[in-house]
């Protein structure tokens, strides 16, 4: 790895519509706003940051595979794939990169089918219900964990 830690942010389906999609649940902040804020935060923490969003499960899996060997930590909002994707789980296990699962809304206060996650039991942690701030907490936690483990 390089001298700087590399953090990868992955966002799943429909998150490209943030800011306009159900703002009562997801807020008015756009994905572009979130990634710009995180890029600046990562820079201030001395970390490298990249991000990828896709509505396609296979594209997210491919990006996870590409992360092996050049990414130190993943922050992932799998969105609806949280509740359905064994394939994302298997990809994350295969690359063995620590990750935090994040959700803008409190999935436990929503429909029962949203209460189950195929990722949470293998994640370092799960952040939900804190809106865009949750992404900041996840990034800060990732850098702190990497800094104390090296």
UniProtKB/Swiss-Prot annotation:
Q: Which protein are we looking at?
A: 3-dehydroquinate dehydratase
GO terms (molecular function) for this protein are: 3-dehydroquinate dehydratase activity
Q: Where is the signal peptide?
A: none
Q: Which PROSITE patterns match?
A: DEHYDROQUINASE_II (PS01029)
Locate the active site.
26, 103
**Pathway it belongs to?**
Metabolic intermediate biosynthesis; chorismate biosynthesis; chorismate from D-erythrose 4-phosphate and phosphoenolpyruvate: step 3/7
EC code:
4.2.1.10
Tell me the name of the encoding gene: aroQ
């Amino acid at each position: 790895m390089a001298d700087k830690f590399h953090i990868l942010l992955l966002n799943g389906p429909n998150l490209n519509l943030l800011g306009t999609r159900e703002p009562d649940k997801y807020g008015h902040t756009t994905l572009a706003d979130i990634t710009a804020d995180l890029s600046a935060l990562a820079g201030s923490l001395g970390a490298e940051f990249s991000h990828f969003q896709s509505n396609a499960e296979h594209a997210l899996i491919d990006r996870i595979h590409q992360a092996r060997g050049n990414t130190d930590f993943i922050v992932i909002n799998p969105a609806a794939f949280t509740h359905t994707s064994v394939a994302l789980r298997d990809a994350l296990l295969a690359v063995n990169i620590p990750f935090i699962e994040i959700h803008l809304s409190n999935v436990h206060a929503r429909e029962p089918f949203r209460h189950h996650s195929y990722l949470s039991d293998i994640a370092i942690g799960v952040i939900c219900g804190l809106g865009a701030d949750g992404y900041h907490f996840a990034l800060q936690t990732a850098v702190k964990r990497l800094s104390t483990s090296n």
